[in-house]
Amino acid sequence: MNYQPTPEDRFTFGLWTVGWQGRDPFGDATRRALDPVETVQRLAGLGAHGVTFHDDDLIPFGSSDTERESHIKRFRQALDATGMAVPMATTNLFTHPVFKDGAFTANDRDVRRYALRKTIRNIDLAAELGAKTYVAWGGREGAESGAAKDVRVALDRMKEAFDLLGEYVTAQGYDLRFAIEPKPNEPRGDILLPTVGHALAFIERLERPELYGVNPEVGHEQMAGLNFPHGIAQALWAGKLFHIDLNGQSGIKYDQDLRFGAGDLRAAFWLVDLLESAGYEGPKHFDFKPPRTEDLDGVWASAAGCMRNYLILKERTAAFRADPEVQEALRAARLDELAQPTAGDGLTALLADRTAFEDFDVEAAAARGMAFEQLDQLAMDHLLGARG
């Protein structure tokens, strides 16, 4: 298989990903800042489909209206010249000190109102540039002290904010949906809507739930010790996987943002298997940080590696599914039986069926092996390249 990506693969990157300068809580930047135009050009050359941005990635915070228009004009010219798309945009509601206690759930009312206006302004730009998804990550929406935040009231304010944003895009006629990005902690000690499940439950309370889905990130769910492919499966089951952030993570620790495929490779295998078999057609967005050990050549090598690893795993998972021995093992594991309704003949028939309870041979059923180990080893063989 050719592992050279093309725009048809729908791989996208945020300006903040390859543009990360390597600054962290313990050290200064190790790389120069990247011009967004340079980023667009380099990513296009690597075969990416598009680029995404926070408002402050593209337009430095505090820019005048004239400066803002100049930045947008240069960016648009780069997009037009390369054919790169902008499938998604988002708002930076976490960097400036004004957001130290959050944005939509800040205790200060004036900060909440400012956050809404800042978001609405960038929604206008996102729609202008053709984005179909608007991501919301509430990195500062949370607390370190149980006394500092009434979580029930904070969720009221969160709901109010999203309802207002939904009202705005509807009134403007924008073809735009929102994707809530969960994260359990960092930078706050505890963040509201920490997992996919929390976000899905929250969405059902909104006035226009059809406008809202989720943008799960590999590392964020794994920081909480959760199974990322399972979270994606539930989002797909709910019809709410509006966007996805791909990266790597090695267990429960800080948010590593490794390139995709680094970290938990088995989870990456099952994730690609799920996305491809489910027919996910949205952008495959890499939200990662090239390690601060790298120079700019290493940055672009890391970005290329994200796409290459996805394509390799796509090939390996397709071979796994097509393998006759795997198909036989799937039948032995009774996956086909799981697809059958448990009581398709209805409750009355279930209650009347003595083989379902009175005459059910519990010991014989308990003695049946599930053949999962053979099936899993076949998956490992394909992942490790030991089978064709």
Curated annotation (Swiss-Prot):
PROSITE patterns, per the entry: XYLOSE_ISOMERASE
Entry EC number(s): 5.3.1.5
Gene that this polypeptide is encoded by: xylA
Residues involved in Mg(2+) 2 binding: E217, H220, D255, D257
This protein's name: Xylose isomerase
Quaternary organization: Homotetramer.
A GO biological process held by the record: D-xylose metabolic process
Cofactor note: Binds 2 magnesium ions per subunit.
Family: Belongs to the xylose isomerase family.
Location of the active site: H54, D57
